[in-house]
């Protein structure tokens, strides 16, 4: 009788612990689902105060990352964490560094190194998320079997592909003399090309804005092509209805500068200034930052 009672107590305690663990897992899943929901990012992207967002993002990113470590199966959390690293590197580290005066070259180098590190950190999180969903993806990518690696991808995978490629190429753009990284750039280009195939209108034409910058900035021997840059610029403006200002800056700072076309350069910057940041609430932060760059 005592032995039977002991067994029952052990079973009861085991079930209690299991239920507690299950409840904790369910609660964490709900929190993660909420944080990773498509609309959650507008808390940041819809803000009109870049300094406020810039101060808040580091804590937010590390909070997301700590949850991600506890929940390695949650792809939405990985997408948010990886993309936030890349957004932060671009908007709050690289962008201020780009605007530093010549005499602050050492500070600029330091900030560029930080941005590169965070670009790659975000990229790696996103690539691992894709490998988790499609086992063998990273191995095929490393072997340059791009078609085989990307064939299973669907439209739902576009955000992971886009941000991984953006972080990858952002890091290379900051440090084009990193030959080891440069050797891997075709993989990033393959990811972005797959985005173009699956969802050319993604995020208001973000992929076309990317290609405006890519074809406009790259040297000829790496695929630079001003005609293609202008073609993607038109498609980016069409996709966004002219409410997102990044394409104007992308064309101005690459093609217009390289062609020494001052008239076009000034015209494009004036178009940035003419867009009301409130016209597209979901991109208010981006348009506010771009407005500062153009002033």
Where are these regions (language model features)?
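Alpha-helical transmembrane segments
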Residues: 11-15
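Short coil/linker segments at helix-helix boundaries
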Residues: 33-66, 70-71, 84-197, 206-239, ...
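C-terminal motif of bacterial Sec signal peptides marking the signal peptidase cleavage site
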Residues: 17-20
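Short helix-capping/linker turns of helical repeat alpha-solenoids
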Residues: 73, 203, 243-244
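Bacterial signal peptide processing site
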Residues: 22-25
């Amino acid at each position: 009788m005592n032995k039977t009672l002991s067994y029952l107590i052990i079973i009861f305690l085991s079930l209690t612990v299991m239920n507690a663990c299950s409840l904790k897992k369910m609660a964490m899943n709900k929190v993660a689902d909420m944080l990773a929901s498509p609309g959650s990012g507008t808390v940041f992207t819809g803000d009109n105060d870049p300094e406020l967002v810039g101060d808040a993002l580091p804590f937010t990113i590390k909070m997301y990352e700590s949850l991600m470590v506890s929940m390695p199966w949650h792809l939405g959390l990985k997408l948010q964490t990886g993309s936030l690293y890349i957004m932060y590197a671009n908007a709050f580290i690289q962008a201020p560094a780009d605007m530093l005066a010549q005499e602050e070259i050492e500070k600029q180098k330091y900030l560029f190194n930080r941005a590169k590190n965070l670009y790659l950190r975000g990229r790696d999180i996103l690539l691992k998320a894709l490998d988790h969903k499609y086992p063998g993806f990273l191995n095929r990518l490393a072997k340059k079997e791009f078609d085989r690696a990307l064939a299973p991808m669907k439209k739902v995978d576009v955000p992971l592909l886009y941000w991984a490629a953006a972080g990858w190429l952002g890091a290379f753009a900051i440090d084009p003399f990193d030959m080891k990284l440069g050797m891997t750039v075709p993989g990033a280009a393959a990811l972005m090309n797959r985005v173009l195939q699956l969802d050319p209108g993604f995020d208001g034409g973000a992929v076309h804005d990317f290609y405006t910058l890519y074809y406009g900035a790259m040297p000829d021997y790496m695929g630079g092509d001003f005609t293609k840059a202008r073609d993607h610029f038109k498609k980016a403006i069409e996709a966004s209805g002219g409410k997102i200002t990044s394409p104007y800056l992308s064309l101005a700072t690459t093609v217009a500068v390289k062609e020494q076309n001052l008239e076009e350069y000034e015209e494009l910057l004036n178009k940035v200034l003419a867009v009301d940041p409130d016209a597209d609430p979901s991109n208010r932060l981006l348009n506010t930052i771009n407005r500062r760059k153009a002033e």
